[in-house]
Amino acid sequence: MIDALRRHIYLEEEFLFPPLRAAGLVAPLFVMVREHGRLWRTLESLQLTLSGSTVSPSALHLCHELAVQLQHHNSKEERILYPQADRVLPPSANAQLRAFLDCGQMPEGWVCHGARS
């Protein structure tokens, strides 16, 4: 699950956000990148916590925190980002997205923009 969420963030930030930014969708993307940073840091904490031999109460807390973050984040994506993407993405961007979904891999060591120092 952690890797799938990271891959989802990569896909959005590298393939979806650039054409949306070029179309003038700046403020919503700023919010999305900031939220991606929070999600990324929660994923890192969760992965570190789960690397032990037992599941600690902090892991359960992090899972709950992640679920809440995702609920808020996804509602914005569904209402704002994805409808705009349907309107402004050129066919070439759609083709890149589909190709990545089919077999693309996130580059080793990639970190989302909102979690970079």
Report the location of each language-model feature.
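Small-residue-biased structural context
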Residues: 1-117
